[in-house]
Regions:
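Conserved SAM-binding loop
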Residues: 62-177, 285-290
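Charge-rich, low-complexity intrinsically disordered regions
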Residues: 1-50
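S-adenosyl-L-methionine-dependent methyltransferase catalytic module, highlighting the catalytic core
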Residues: 106-123, 147-153, 161-289
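Generic anion/oxyanion-binding catalytic loop in active/binding sites
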Residues: 4, 137, 244
């Protein structure tokens, strides 16, 4: 099998190079540190340690689509490359709606790119076969992970790539929420979720924590007014066709395991290569489909 991507395995050299606080450790101490702490922390272990290094894998590709772009397109640097690739952007909303939303939530309306595909209208409309699709912090918002991967495969050339980043659940407001399991993914698939489940909306609205490093666990709360928050989350779920919420909570290891299982079960498009690169607060996933 051909290897398209750099290794995602633990490298002593890269671990030392990318973790400044560990540079004085011996090889033996580095290996022990990774085993005891670094793996759980999602520290950089390979030559792919930041978003730019990850996106550089796309150099030479000539047709690209970035989805879930909002006001932060990440492929503009490729437009200046000698290959002058075709670059399209897609989002659930159209450009005018994204500009309005950016103004409302304190984002940059001037950075919203031209939206070629409004994904609320489905992937069937897309009549371009791309070399690669890219997304950042988009996958965790997909109600049905299996269906999402089939959608992506449907707009790729044979052997096309899907490159994406996902927040590490232990480094964001999802800290106290349990990791998603294969059963969660299978439930969403067999029930054909088209929007986040009430469980996901409730977790996202009530049980996330932006002060998780202080150990304030919302799951331990006995505050009476929490009942009002539960009702608000339920009303939002019932009154809207779609709610923007995290449907999944992953670590690099848990995500890799679930994708490997789905591939073995033949529930997702056949994968030629899968690499997962930890990078601290997020991790990067490179998939080459058959």
């Amino acid at each position: 099998m051909e290897n398209y991507f750099p290794s995602d395995q633990f490298s002593l050299e890269e671990y030392r190079l990318n973790n400044f606080d560990l540079r004085s450790l011996s090889d033996e101490q580095l290996a022990e540190h990774y085993k005891e702490y670094g793996k759980k922390e999602g520290r950089v272990i390979s030559c792919i340690g930041n978003k730019q290094e990850f996106l550089n894998l796309l150099l030479g590709k000539t047709s690209l689509l970035e989805i879930g772009v909002f006001d932060a397109p990440s492929l503009d640097f490729l437009a200046q490359s000698g290959d002058t690739p075709l670059i399209h952007y897609g989002d659930y909303l159209g450009r005018d709606d994204l500009i309005a939303r950016a103004s409302q939530v304190g984002r940059n309306p001037h950075s919203v790119p031209e939206i070629r595909w409004v994904l609320a209208d489905g992937y069937e409309q897309i009549d371009v076969d791309y070399d690669a699709v890219v997304s950042h912090h988009c996958v965790e918002h997909q109600p049905d992970l299996v269906a999402h991967l089939w959608d992506i495969k449907s707009i790729l050339k044979s052997g096309g790539w899907y490159l994406f980043s996902i927040p590490h659940k232990n480094h964001c407001f999802d800290y106290f929420i349990q990791e998603s399991t294969i059963v969660d993914v299978l439930t969403a698939y067999y029930l054909r979720y088209k929007k986040p489940s009430f469980k996901s909306v409730l977790e996202h609205r009530v049980f996330t924590s932006h002060s998780f490093r202080d150990g304030i666990n919302p799951y331990n709360s006995e505050i009476p007014h929490m009942k009002n928050l539960f009702q608000l989350a339920f009303d939002e779920f019932c009154d809207n066709e779609y709610v923007d919420a995290h449907c999944w909570q992953f670590t690099p290891c848990s995500f890799q395991k679930i994708i490997q299982q789905l591939n073995a079960f033949e529930l997702i498009p056949n994968i030629n290569e899968l690499k997962v690169y930890p990078a601290g607060v997020e991790f990067y996933v490179a998939i080459a489909f058959a």
